[in-house]
A protein has these predicted regions:
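Glycine/proline-enriched, intrinsically flexible loops and inter-domain linkers
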Residues: 1-285
Length: 285
């Protein structure tokens, strides 16, 4: 309770924050209970062996799919257009090398870390290539960490995608981290275009970044409110070789994630929607 009180004291929306945090704690408790039930029913060794087999199966399946692709080198760039301090471009540069059954994502030529909050750390960077490979190459497979055995990620400490403490990172996930994802997806797509069989499964880039409409103010009773309307979950998917991209597809790494219903938003917050529409031929066209 003391820890919770400390956290809530530092939140502008303590009621929502406490509810969210307690939900996460409850979810962790459910996972622990379900895992204990599995161990009790089948025995710890069997459960551990099945987990290991699942990781190994995914690694083998991805290895075979990578082998079927042509060896080569592909380069891509993505940009972040403002770091919160200066209106200047920061560039994420990627060189993808495919050799045999391994993919190497090299970000070492990316720009140095920024003064503002757009930097990301190494774990955030790693999620970019991982997500791109999962979405493009792992259909019909179990998505798990075994896939990472076929991927190598090179980065330079002190760069925009592998910053050093105390570089600011508050918006890193949706700025440089997202740019690393977009660069990875573009490189994988270009690689697939060079393959005879993989070409028909290639996708263009999805929406380049997420966005959120942040609203705040006071209710009629004087109490404060604040929230983000996560409308970017309705962005379009990348065009495919045989058809347009899906409308309102979500994110490349989280398809069909959706967004808050208009009615729900208006019931919870003092706001009014005049309309919510899809823009023709926008992201995902």
């Amino acid at each position: 309770d003391e820890v919770m009180a400390t956290l809530m004291t530092n939140s502008r929306t303590p009621a929502l924050a406490e509810l969210d945090l307690r939900a996460q704690v409850a979810a962790a408790g459910v996972v622990r209970r379900r895992m204990t039930e599995l161990f009790d029913k089948y025995g710890a060794q069997i459960v551990v062996d099945v987990m290991a087999d699942s990781l190994r199966d995914s690694e083998i399946m991805l290895r075979n799919r990578i082998r079927a692709l042509p060896d080569g080198v592909w380069k891509t760039e993505e940009h972040v257009d403002h770091d919160g301090h200066s209106d200047s471009l920061t560039t994420i540069r990627l060189t993808l090398t495919k050799s045999g059954d391994t993919l190497i994502f090299d970000f070492t030529d990316s720009d140095d870390e920024a003064a503002g909050l757009i930097n990301c750390t190494r774990p955030t960077l790693e999620s970019g290539p991982f997500s791109a490979v999962l979405t493009h190459l792992c259909a019909g497979m179990t998505w798990n960490e075994g896939i990472m055995d076929r991927i190598r990620i090179d980065s330079r400490p002190g760069s925009i995608v592998d910053c050093n403490f105390p570089a600011p990172v508050a918006s890193g996930v949706i700025n440089s981290g997202w740019a690393a994802l977009d660069a990875s997806a573009a490189a994988v797509a270009r690689m697939m275009l060079d393959g005879q069989e993989s070409r028909k499964l290639t996708m263009a880039g999805w929406a380049g970044a997420p966005y959120g409409v942040n609203i705040f103010g006071k209710r009629e009773n004087g109490r404060s409110f604040a929230t983000m309307l996560g409308l970017s979950g309705l962005q379009g998917g990348g065009a495919r070789s045989f058809a347009d991209g899906y409308d309102a597809a979500g994110y490349l790494h989280s398809p069909r994630c959706g967004a808050m219903n208009v009615e729900t938003a208006e019931a919870r917050f003092p706001i009014l929607h005049l309309f919510r529409r899809l823009a023709p031929d926008s992201g995902g066209a």
